[in-house]
Structure formats: structure tokens, C-alpha cells
């Protein structure tokens, strides 16, 4: 079966591709996984919802375990029979805080009359899709807000615990991906390649700083160097402190990033 467990069409369901980030779940046996933004790129992902899923793995070890995963309740971690609505959280901008154009603003996908109409659930709930943002990393702060690292800006996106956007998208000063709103509007030139934004993000053990790691080198920086920018969570601004990660070889790439303690 090339489609996995369920064959299309997917009535009231959505295929899910790879996981990009993970957080602790509601209990010690569950984890929260964030899916990648869509199915190939911004131009093919307008109806792909940006979601997190609660997953309960049964690790296979020397003493037992099946090595399988199952759905769990997002709020409690309790086992579920399938990945139904209680197992997931979907990002939304119902309060219109993001200050970016999103698919829910349009009648037709991509604001193109030749495309299908925007799904009513996306429209009504102002649900965020893979054409709006490319979230690759996520951290939960000490106030239970969530911070998402995006690649289209690159932007930092702040939501509450329910996935509702709390403020405008935060740009990284001086860095512009091709999809950044200022590049699209002709106000800036891109200096970061596509899919080069915040692939990895760590949070300090105190929960007061984020460290956002770019996936690609900014134009003009030494080849093979990736910027890590420090962000003050309480002040909601970049501190100006910047670090550099050196790739060992050109074909290497980074994934996620985790702080072990305050200085490492």
C-alpha cells in the first residue's frame, strides 16, 4: 500500500508527514510531536494544517515493549484508539495578531480565483497552514506559551497553550528569506536561501532565553557557518547576542538543538 494504512480519498482526515520537533507530553509516557509544514513546499500546502500530535510510544527494550506508537490525549496523555481531535492541537490566528497574509484571509487558495475555495474550517477558525508558515522548531516557555521557529521569515511565532497566536510574527533583524513579507513586497532583498530558517531552537533551563539556529548560511557569512541568535522571552526581543555553529562538512546539516544546562 503506497499510501500507508489508509488509502485516499481522506474524508475528514489529513495525511501527516515527518515530525520536525518534540516536546514532553502531558504525562511521562507521552510526547508532543510537531509535523512538518506540508507536502513539498509552500505552493502545495495551502490546506495542510499546522498541528502538533500527542503520541504514546511503547519503546522496545531488552525487557520488552512492542516498538509501536499510538495516539494519546493532548491534555492528559491518556491512550486513545486513533489520532482523533483530542490527540492534536492546530495553530490558529483567530484573533488576527500575526500581521501576515494567511490563507484564511482569502476566498480561494493563494488568492487565486482558478484555485479551489478555501476550506470552511480554515476560514472560520483562521487555521494556519503550510502555505502561511513553515514551522520547524518549537519550545514551551515557563509561562506555558509556545514559541515556534519558522523558515519563511524567518519568524518567531508565539502562541498560547491552545495554539492561538498571541502577537505579531517576530522577524530576525537583517535576515530575509525569499518568502519574508518585506521581500515579497519589494522592500528588501533576500539574503538567506529558501528552507534556511529556524530549523533548530533551544530554550535555556531557566526558561527565559531562546536560541534560534538557522539551517543555512546568511549571504556574506563564512561558508559553512550557521547563526544562533539569542532571544529574551520576557522582553520578546532579540538580545543582540549571536553565536556561530560551524558545519564539519558542506554536505552536513543540522536538525534540532537542545540546551543541556545554562552554558551548554
Regions found by a protein language model. Name each.
Residues 1-264:
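Sequence/structural signature of beta-propeller domains
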Amino acid at each position: 500500500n503506497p499510501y500507508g494504512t489508509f488509502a485516499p480519498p481522506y474524508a475528514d482526515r489529513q495525511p501527516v508527514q515527518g515530525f520536525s520537533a518534540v516536546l514532553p507530553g502531558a504525562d511521562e509516557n507521552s510526547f508532543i510531536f510537531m509535523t512538518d509544514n506540508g507536502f513539498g513546499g509552500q505552493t502545495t500546502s495551502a490546506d495542510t494544517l499546522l498541528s502538533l500530535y500527542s503520541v504514546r510510544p511503547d519503546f522496545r527494550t531488552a525487557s520488552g515493549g512492542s516498538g509501536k506508537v499510538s495516539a494519546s490525549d493532548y491534555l492528559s496523555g491518556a491512550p486513545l484508539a486513533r489520532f482523533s481531535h483530542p490527540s492534536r492541537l492546530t495553530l490558529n490566528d483567530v484573533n488576527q495578531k500575526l500581521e501576515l497574509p494567511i490563507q484564511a484571509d482569502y476566498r480561494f487558495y493563494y488568492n487565486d480565483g482558478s484555485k479551489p475555495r478555501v476550506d470552511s474550517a480554515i476560514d472560520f477558525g483562521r487555521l494556519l497552514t503550510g502555505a502561511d508558515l513553515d514551522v520547524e522548531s518549537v519550545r514551551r516557555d515557563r509561562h506555558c506559551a509556545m514559541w515556534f521557529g519558522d523558515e519563511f521569515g524567518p519568524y518567531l511565532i508565539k502562541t498560547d497553550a491552545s495554539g492561538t497566536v498571541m502577537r505579531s510574527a517576530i522577524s530576525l533583524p537583517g535576515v530575509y528569506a525569499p518568502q519574508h513579507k518585506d521581500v515579497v513586497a519589494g522592500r528588501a532583498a533576500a539574503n538567506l536561501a529558501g528552507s534556511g530558517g529556524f530549523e533548530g531552537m533551544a530554550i535555556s533551563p531557566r526558561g527565559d532565553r531562546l536560541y534560534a539556529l538557522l539551517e543555512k548560511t546568511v549571504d556574506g557569512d563564512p561558508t559553512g557557518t550557521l547563526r544562533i541568535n539569542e532571544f529574551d522571552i520576557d522582553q520578546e526581543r532579540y538580545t543582540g547576542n549571536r553565536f556561530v555553529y560551524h558545519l564539519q562538512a558542506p554536505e552536513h546539516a543540522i536538525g534540532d538543538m537542545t540546551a543541556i544546562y545554562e552554558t551548554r
